[in-house]
C-alpha cells in the first residue's frame, strides 16, 4: 500500500513540475508579446522615450530600404523627426510567433504587420537586461507576393546596381 501511495505521490509531483515548466515558458512568451505590443504602440503614439527605452543601448535596427542599417544612436537620430510630427509609424500585428531560449535570457520572433506600406514582416531578438525584455535586433521587410517579384526587381534594378557597386568598391 505504501508503494502505491509513493508512486501516486511521485506522479503527482512530476506532473506539477511539468505543468509549472510549461506555464513559465508561456509566461515568458506573454512577456515578450507585451513588450513588442508596447513598442509598436509607442511608435503609433509618437512616444520617443518609451519606444527607445524598450531597445538595448547597443541594439540594431534594419529597415526596408537597403541603406537602413542602424545602430541605436543612428536609429534614434533618424526616428526623432518622425516622432516629433506626432505619429511615427503605426504597425498593427496580424500574427506573431515567439521562441524562448531554454535559459529564458533570449527570445526571437517573427511577425506579420499591417502598416502604411501594406503587409510587412518583422523579426528580431530580445534579451533580458536587469530582468526586463529589451529588443536587441529588429528587421523590417516589405512582404512582396511572389507573382510581383519580377516587376519589383525590374523597378529597382538600376538602384540596386548602383548600390551594389557602392558596397563592393574597395
Each model region followed by its residue ranges:
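Bacterial Sec-dependent N-terminal signal peptides
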Residues: 1-26
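Short, aromatic-enriched amphipathic alpha-helices that serve as compact interaction elements
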Residues: 28-47, 160-163
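Short, well-ordered alpha-helical segments enriched in acidic and aromatic residues
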Residues: 45-58, 62
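A mature extracytoplasmic/lumenal domain signature
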Residues: 55, 65, 95, 111-115, ...
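A short gly/proline-enriched turn/hairpin at secondary-structure junctions
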Residues: 59-70, 82-88
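Surface-exposed, charged secondary-structure patches
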Residues: 74-119, 168-170
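A short, structured loop/turn motif at beta-sheet edges
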Residues: 99-105, 126-134
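Low-complexity, intrinsically disordered terminal/linker segments enriched in charged
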Residues: 129, 137-170
Amino acid at each position: 500500500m505504501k508503494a502505491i501511495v509513493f508512486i501516486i505521490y511521485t506522479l503527482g509531483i512530476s506532473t506539477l513540475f511539468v505543468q509549472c515548466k510549461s506555464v513559465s515558458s508561456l509566461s515568458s512568451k506573454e512577456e515578450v508579446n507585451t513588450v513588442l505590443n508596447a513598442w509598436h504602440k509607442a511608435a503609433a503614439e509618437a512616444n520617443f522615450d518609451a519606444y527607445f527605452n524598450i531597445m538595448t543601448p547597443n541594439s540594431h535596427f534594419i529597415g526596408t530600404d537597403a541603406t537602413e542599417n542602424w545602430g541605436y544612436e543612428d536609429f534614434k537620430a533618424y526616428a526623432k523627426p518622425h516622432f516629433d510630427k506626432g505619429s511615427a509609424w503605426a504597425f498593427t500585428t496580424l500574427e506573431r510567433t515567439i521562441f524562448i531560449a531554454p535559459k529564458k535570457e533570449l527570445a526571437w520572433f517573427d511577425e506579420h504587420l499591417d502598416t502604411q506600406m501594406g503587409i510587412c514582416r518583422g523579426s528580431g531578438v530580445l534579451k533580458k537586461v536587469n530582468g526586463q525584455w529589451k529588443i536587441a535586433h529588429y528587421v523590417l521587410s516589405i512582404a512582396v507576393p511572389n507573382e510581383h517579384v519580377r516587376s519589383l526587381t525590374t523597378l529597382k534594378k538600376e538602384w540596386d546596381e548602383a548600390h551594389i557597386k557602392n558596397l563592393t568598391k574597395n
